[in-house]
Regions:
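Long, well-ordered, tryptophan-enriched scaffold segments
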Residues: 278-505, 726-734
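Conserved small/polar residues in nucleotide/adenosyl-binding loops
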Residues: 764-766
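Active-site phosphate/pyrophosphate-binding segments
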Residues: 366, 495, 635-747, 754
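Cofactor-binding active-site loop characterized by glycine-rich and histidine/acidic residues
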Residues: 85, 89-102, 106-116, 123-267, ...
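A glycine-rich helix N-cap at a beta->alpha junction
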Residues: 174-185, 268-275, 303-304, 633-648
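N-terminal amphipathic, basic-rich helices that act as targeting or association modules
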Residues: 2-171, 439, 514-518, 522, ...
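Non-catalytic terminal/interface segments that mediate subunit docking, oligomerization
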Residues: 85-106, 127, 142-146, 153, ...
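A short alpha/beta connector and helix-capping loop motif
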Residues: 254-279, 630, 637
Length: 766
């Protein structure tokens, strides 16, 4: 009982953030006057005026030499106070029932699969913790593709939450019961469901592969930027399309997750929303057991220039926060580390009373009227639809910054003592009959005790209030998600014959294949048929490849245009940035460049517009460095050209082995949709490029053409008559000679870097 619990008088490091030194208030009366003044300004003139005054004071303090401690964190409470919450527009009761049914079907799908097929795998706990985050989005925010089929939001669903998306699609009538029974069994007669979002396996359903972890965040950032690129170049209106990325707090340890967030703020991508499910757990245990991951991420994203919205506590905590005039509750919330919060999840209310509130007598007094059961049921913010709705609504208000929502949840929410908040939650994929009964009862699923063990899927009658509401909400928002069109818009493309004369000009000259391919790329950017669709992508190597002449011709894309006079403005090939620029100059990031390639290479399915990416880079820094993103490109059916520059035995020998690429062709063989070539002559690169244009864009094939290009000058030979087909297939007869009285006949094979040696060898008399 509350009246027999004694407050903890000794501060302990156990379960708490280490204490920090704070300033002593030497004049409490003066402090209260300042606080009252600020409260008056907020009340009478609004938060904008208060913000201005505080900024002015901060600036004055700096001018007078007052050193203020850097503060990147706000208190461990919700960013949006109750009084600023918008009214919730939906039917809370119907939405709760729909969400509960989806929870059951998602859980039953995984448990059933592992009951009948031992070791099949799957994940329950991620969606269990994030169901509210998704359902508020599906019911009120996520825009479908609409009548055009290409005007919806782009959503990167967290890979481990895929069972929840399947369960919702089942209710919508897009998936059958047999589909759900075949979870992770794609080869069954009636199509099964892939483990994670895989467009290659489910081309009409998934759009974006988000596994392995870290891929979704970086690709979503560059997708949001590419949407702006399309709009600024006048190719497609994308202003109303949002990019949502759902990810986990543990996923933020992946370099790709946080590595490009500064680009998002630099490009003012207020069309981008990250939702981080902070359930405080990863596979092995706590994400930050001895710290506070929400505070850590808040500091990181704030420092990178993002809007940060914290959704930490549910509405049950509001009366306590309002009643606490001492500030001790907010202080206690900040003191407790994540590992201890995880402990509270699995403990009774009496433990929470003693170990959380019991630290201070005032807090025990605050909850003396609360039963232990009531304390147990006080939710985290990510499980409160009204708090989540308020966060999403604010994120939709564009202010020139991307937004991250840090939503605190419980991993395995609803799974009971065997899975809720436990370290084993991530790998949980089985449940006994008692656990199923408890889950059924907790979420009110109309399945009898006798049938629970069979794990049947449940779908309300078509004329039920739940089904009518579910379908009406999605119709209002433009249709179901995720969804991917399978029809491919084809386009008229130029042929090799259109460019043959340009190629023939090189015959007999000493040139590199890099120079040849850049010439073709420059011409293609001006081509009447496809010029505006070409997307040159370079990770800060344009001058290495001799592309600087394209700066003035087509411009470098910059969302704000060029706000300065470039130092080389008096030169012909000056560094020209423009809002409608065509080149994506990505800086030193092959990963970011590949993410742009993926966005451009899937524009045909995402936007209904064929864009043609040409990603040129140092060949050594391609497949072996960003192979996972290339695999994602293949999975999401991207198309385009990857050009591996300075390939083979480069003339840059002084650069060392890091620039001696003899194996990227071997790496390329690991990617099923990649067609890899090692040309030696410019006519070969030209034939391959125009073959790629014809097959990928003229005929609609899904492929990526990888073409190695070198920087060693070759004497450009004439193209042998009738060799086009052989070039595309990978082998053709370049030259032959008969030698009188020869003792035998030798066939020599060669390409790219070795071909000069092969040609010299062919002159030896046997």
């Amino acid at each position: 009982m509350a009246d027999v619990i004694k407050p903890q008088t000794n501060s302990t490091d156990k379960g708490e953030v280490p204490a920090v030194k704070v300033s002593v208030d030497v004049d409490p009366l003066e402090t209260s006057e300042w606080i009252e003044s600020l409260e008056y300004v907020i009340r009478s003139k609004g938060t904008d005026r208060a913000h201005f005054l505080l900024e002015t004071l901060e600036r004055l303090a700096a001018e007078k030499g007052v050193e203020l401690p850097f503060q990147s964190n706000t208190p461990y409470i919700n960013t949006i106070p109750t009084e600023r919450q918008p009214a919730y527009p939906g039917n809370r009761e119907l939405e709760r029932r729909i969400k509960s049914i989806i929870r059951w079907n998602a859980m039953a799908m995984v448990v059933r699969a592992n009951k009948y097929f031992e070791g099949l795998g799957g994940h329950i706990s991620t969606f269990a913790s994030s169901a509210t985050l998704y359902e508020v989005g599906f019911q009120h925010f996520f825009r479908g593709r609409g009548e055009s089929g290409y005007d919806g939001d782009h959503i990167y669903f967290q890979g481990h939450a895929s069972p929840g998306m399947y369960a919702r699609a089942f209710l919508e009538g897009r998936l059958t019961e047999e589909n759900l029974k075949n979870f992770r069994r794609e080869m069954q007669p009636e199509s099964g469901l892939s483990s994670y979002p895989h467009p290659w396996l489910m081309p009409s359903f998934w759009e974006y592969p988000t596994v392995s972890m870290g891929l979704g965040p970086i690709m979503s950032i560059y997708q949001a930027r590419f949407n702006r690129y399309l709009e600024n170049r006048g190719i497609k209106e994308t202003a109303n399309q949002r990019v949502w990325a759902f990810l986990g707090d543990g996923e933020c340890d992946e370099p790709e997750t946080l590595g490009a967030i500064s680009m998002a703020s630099r490009e003012k991508l207020d069309n981008l929303i990250f939702v981080i499910n902070c359930n405080l757990q990863r596979l092995d245990g706590p994400v930050r057991g001895n710290g506070k991951v929400i505070q850590e991420l808040e500091a990181i994203f704030k420092g990178a220039g993002w809007n940060v919205i914290k959704v930490v506590w549910g509405e049950e905590w509001e009366p306590l926060l309002a009643a606490d005039k001492t500030g001790l509750l907010s202080k206690r919330m900040m003191e407790v580390v994540d590992g201890q919060y995880q402990k509270y999840t699995g403990m009774p209310g009496s433990y929470i009373r003693e170990h959380f509130f019991g630290k201070y007598p005032e807090l025990l007094e605050l909850v003396k009227g609360y039963s232990d059961e009531r304390l147990e049921k006080m939710r985290r913010g990510g499980h409160d639809p009204e708090k989540v709705y308020a966060a999403y609504a604010q994120a939709m208000q564009q202010n020139g910054k991307p937004t991250v929502i840090l939503a605190k949840t419980i991993k395995g929410y609803g799974l009971g003592e065997s899975g809720e908040g436990r370290n084993i939650a991530h790998n949980k994929k089985k449940a006994n009959e008692q656990e199923l009964l408890e889950f059924r009862s907790r979420f009110g699923i109309p399945i009898s005790d006798e049938d629970v063990g069979k794990m049947p899927f449940y779908k309300p009658p078509e004329n039920s209030a739940e089904m009518k509401y579910l379908l009406a909400q999605r119709e209002k928002l433009g249709g179901s998600l995720p969804s991917r069109p399978t029809t491919v818009t084809k386009m008229e493309v130029p042929s090799f014959e259109d460019y043959r004369k340009i190629v023939e000009r090189d015959y007999g000259k000493d040139l590199s294949t890099t120079m040849g391919v850049v010439r073709i790329l420059s011409r293609l950017c001006k081509d009447k048929k496809i010029g505006k669709n070409v997307v040159p992508i370079v990770p800060d190597e344009s001058r290495t490849f001799g592309m600087e002449g394209m700066f003035r011709e087509v411009g470098i894309y910059a969302h704000a245009g060029q706000l300065y006079e470039p130092i080389d403005s008096d030169q012909l090939a000056y560094y020209k940035e423009a809002k409608n620029g065509q080149i994506l100059e990505e800086g030193i990031t092959e990963a970011g460049s590949m993410a742009s390639f993926n966005a451009a290479g899937t524009a045909y399915s995402a936007h209904g517009v064929n864009m043609i990416p040409f990603f040129i880079y140092y060949s050594m820094f391609g497949f072996q460095r960003i192979g996972d993103l290339v695999w994602a490109a293949a999975d999401m059916r991207a198309k385009g050209f990857m050009l591996g520059g300075t390939a083979g035995r480069t003339t840059l020998n002084g650069e060392g082995l890091q620039h001696q690429d003899g194996h990227s062709l071997l790496n390329a063989m690991a990617f099923p949709t990649v067609r890899a070539y090692d040309p030696a002559f410019n006519y070969e690169t030209a034939v391959l490029i125009f073959d790629g244009l014809k097959k990928m864009y003229g005929e609609g094939e899904t492929a990526i053409y990888y073409i190695m290009v070198g920087n060693e000058n070759y004497a450009m030979a004439e193209m042998p008559e009738g060799s086009e087909e052989g070039i595309v297939k990978g082998m053709y007869r370049f030259r032959s000679r008969d030698v009188k009285n020869a003792k035998g006949r030798v066939q020599l094979f060669g390409s790219g870097a070795i071909l000069n040696g092969v040609l010299k060898l062919s002159l030896i008399h046997i």
